[in-house]
Amino acid sequence: MTKKLLKAGAALLVKKKTESQWHEDDLRTIENYRPLDDDFMRELFRNDLPLAQLVLRIITGIEDLELTKEETQYDLKRLLGSRSICLDVFGTDSKGRKFDLEIQRADRGATPQRARYHSSAIDVEFLKAKEKFEELPVSYVIFITENDVRGENKLIYNFEWTDTANGTPLNDGAHIIFVNGAYNNAEDTSDLAKLVHDFRCKRAEDMKIKELADKTRYFKETPEGVSIMCKAIEEMRNEAEKLRTYQIALNLIAMGTLTDEAIAKATDLTLEEIAELKAQASAVTA
């Protein structure tokens, strides 16, 4: 009886809907998406180096910035034993400079400490063994925030290490930038103000930067683009379901009252997956 109840409970975690109901929900989600939503932002920038280059030029003020490589959801691979991070948009330019572009809607996700960790993680990732410290690449960690997390009503906040006595820059090559997504000044006609305005828009027709409007229109108003977005949303939904199932299995493992076979049956996971989860749980608690 216990096994049947567990399996029933796991199934009820996700409300069953028809395919057409899911599709209608997805269309509403797409309609309400803004570039300030990180799921949509990643699709906007995926495999679109020119758009990423344009946005980075506007934010950094580097007019001749030539992006040579751009990836979305970039995993830093050299943080073994440390907290892992996945960068929303990551790029490298012709001078070897590294750019991390992040969307942070929640204030708690846009702390100075988080920005510091991103900057440090990029340093670790791109300085190989035996290389000189002077070979560290120049890096830009950019947080576009939904709210004015710094509270000074500025459009952009630029941070570098400086001498606290006289303001002389350290020139270590690390830059941290917060872009205030809540900034709204009708008299500001700068490209950055236009960009921030567009990041809040749901409709392409309301946007001021053509390149961003065109890409938004593609994903929201063309059959091909909408299909891509629906597939991306479905993949995210499936991943969320899988993570919930893993969490149920981990809870059952922690209880210690069921066999691996019973847990696998209750969660529809394989015995191999249960064994891997147990190994991960043991590593965390060791």
Q: Which residues are covered by each model-predicted region?
A:
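Accessory alpha/beta interaction modules
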Residues: 1-175, 185-187, 286
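Short, charged alpha-helical interaction segments and adjacent helix-coil junctions
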Residues: 2-31, 92, 99-104, 190-286
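Short amphipathic alpha-helical signal-transduction/dimerization elements
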Residues: 119, 123, 146, 183, ...
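Compact structured core domains
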Residues: 174-198
